[in-house]
């Protein structure tokens, strides 16, 4: 009787210790005897002791990968520093686990290569004014390339585009000159309107005096 009770307690402990609760927006990749068995979605699951193991816990939420600045060369041979932000989701936990050794390293390398290829076909001015187009091209290329890894790229953003200091200085001077030009135009238009209003006021006053 005591032996039976001990066995029951051990079985109960074994079951409890092998209960797994998968939270919302998560997935568990399960291996049985070293080989892929199944993928658990949200809910309560029981793992077979000694036979099954959780190979990987995967988040299904959108994730953000903020990569450090990468040196890139434009079509007109200007070297710039550009850092990218990639927003992605894991859509297939099995492929994500077994498709590639280090997914994040692979995404970073792929992002850098794709960015260099796109920027290499554009001149500096195009790079500075075509950010949305570059973002869109990168997203399409990265999404297609990462699909075999169980990853969907939702969007890509170029966070900073930093040309060489001498070009930055020239751009700042050009922007300052453009601001001053616009201010001068606005000032001249304001003075013109004021002069017109003053002339119209004097004209009306003269008419009133003549009528009197």
Where are the regions a protein language model picked out?
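Single-pass alpha-helical transmembrane signal-anchor segments
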Residues: 1-19
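Short helix-to-loop capping/linker segments positioned immediately adjacent to catalytic or ligand/cofactor-binding
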Residues: 16-18, 125-131, 141-146, 184-186, ...
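Hydrophobic alpha-helical segments and their boundary regions
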Residues: 6-7, 23, 32, 66, ...
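Amphipathic, interface-forming alpha-helical segments with heptad-repeat character
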Residues: 22, 30-41, 45-178
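Long, charge-rich amphipathic alpha-helical coiled-coil "stalk/tentacle" segments
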Residues: 166-212
